[in-house]
Amino acid sequence: MAQAEAPVEQATGEQEREAENTGTKAIAETHRFDEAALAKWMAANVEGYAGPLEVRQFKGGQSNPTYQLVTPGRNYVMRRKPPGKLLPSAHAVDREFRVISALHPTGFPVAKPYGLCTDDSVVGTMFYVMEMVEGRILWDQSLPAYAPPERHAIHMAALKTLADLHNTDYKAMGLEGFGRPGNYMSRQIDRWTKQYKASETQPLEAMERLIEWLPKSVPEDDQTTIVHADYRLDNMVMHATESRVVAVLDWELCTLGNPLADFTYVLMQWVNGTIAAIPDLTAHGIPTMEEYVAEYCRLTGRSGLPELNWYFAYNAFRLAGILQGIVGRVRDGTANSPQAAAQEARVPLLAEAAWKFAKMAGA
């Protein structure tokens, strides 16, 4: 499995990123709302709710403002669309709510959904409320605080949960219309091309080459499943003491599509992310890419994974498009976090990495 040269550097160190994204903060002025109106809505729509209500804003969450709702008996989480000018396909909190509402009864680890509000008059934008799941958020993929056996167990637990998602019968859950089966990769390339162009701040030759090459070289979609589309350790809650996923978070990008797009996005950590920088994965306790691929194939009944370099090129291109969208929101004044501006430097690095993978895939 070939790898591109030179890992793409993170915008900040993992410890800094954890500090920036862990815990709550005072509600940003641009994200304040009528808390009394929210409490009234909760009383009418959330079973078992009893005030008084205290609202705090979580740090991080650059896409959709996320709040901790504290009551004497129970804590909740609210996610809402940000105010201001928005890209048409972004911030789909209603889709998040729909998918966790479908998954929760099956036993798949998601937070219990309590209610969706599409009435902008309550807090200013659409929002939903779910339970607050307690446990560990693991920001550093290398898991420096853990012994090698637990590192291995945590990564394999995350992998099993992803395989469980891809093995789920979405039709039986009422999600047949959640996305369009077939041509997923082509549609995703088109989506992220449009987002990149809508938010473009500087011309990048590598992105232009990818925009031309990727649609012409798409592998055949061989399966349609639920895809999370942003699956990584820091988008899940791990049990407080066990190597077990208790909730997968941030379903904004979820749709029906090719599960290999999901899985190879996870694999990017092995080729140009934190895990790629570890010299001896086995000694560290983290599965090698070969082990991870073999186990995913075993869990999902595959004989192998073709054209990995094409998927790596696509995933780096896609991430460049996502980050360029954040850059655009900073420019337009709708970004949730001042740290979002730092992402701009990553876009050309990702574009160059994507083109290296594309060349290894035959471009």
Task: Write out the residue ranges for each language-model feature.
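All-alpha amphipathic helical-bundle segments outside canonical DNA-binding/catalytic cores
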Residues: 179-180, 303-315
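Active-site activation/catalytic loop segments of kinase-like enzymes and analogous catalytic loops
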Residues: 261-300, 315-332
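Activation of the activation-loop gatekeeper triad in protein kinase-fold domains
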Residues: 249-254
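Hydrophobic residue at the +6 position relative to the catalytic HRD Asp in the kinase catalytic loop
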Residues: 236-238
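Helical subdomain adjoining the active site within ATP-dependent kinase catalytic cores
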Residues: 304, 309, 321-363
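Juxta-kinase regulatory segment immediately upstream of eukaryotic protein kinase catalytic domains
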Residues: 13-49
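Catalytic-loop of the protein kinase fold
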Residues: 226-228, 233
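ATP-binding pocket architecture of kinase catalytic cores
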Residues: 52-226, 240-242
